[in-house]
Amino acid sequence: METALAEVQLSCLLCEQTFDATEKLDEHLPTHFPQPVSTGQTCDICGRTMRSSLELHQHYKRYHEAHVPNTEGHFQCQLCDKVFLLQDHLKVHVKIEHATDGYQPDEKSLDWQHYSPRSLDTTNDYKLDPILCPPPKRKYPPRSPFFNPNLWLGADNCFM
């Protein structure tokens, strides 16, 4: 019986080339099915892969903004050395972290040229700032069967 298995010729279904061992056929098949070339962009910091360079840039801004090295056009906090790509994010950082420290940002910002620590009032700013106080979540109707499984119709009720 073993001699019959040894004489079996395996053929490739795509090019009809014959092989005497399954290992050789397995080595041959990748010639017809090459591995896809990775077109994704990989984050240097965390290793996550994005589909485009735009998604990678948005990923950097969202998750690694404080870890980006300081270059021209970036805004650096003078107290904790965090770096932000957008000036608005630096402002929010200042409001949250250093509002009572008497902090003055660097000269890149025109809004802060007339800044004095005594004039910074953060008591009512949180009501106007959408970053510090996001809008409330939407409320869905409590009687909606989509969100309440107790209101789902059983399959046995449909055939009566």
Curated annotation (Swiss-Prot):
The modification Phosphotyrosine is found at Y115. The keyword ATP-binding does not apply. The modification Phosphoserine is found at S116. A zinc finger (C2H2-type) spans 10-32, 41-64, 75-98. Keywords: DNA-binding, Metal-binding, Nucleus, Phosphoprotein, Repeat, Transcription, Transcription regulation, Zinc, Zinc-finger. InterPro entries: ZnF_C2H2-type_TF, Znf_C2H2_sf, Znf_C2H2_type. GO terms for molecular function: DNA binding; zinc ion binding. GO terms for cellular component: nucleus. It is found in: Nucleus. Its main location: nucleus. It comes from the Eukaryota. May be involved in transcriptional regulation. This is Uncharacterized zinc finger protein CG12744. It comes from Drosophila melanogaster.
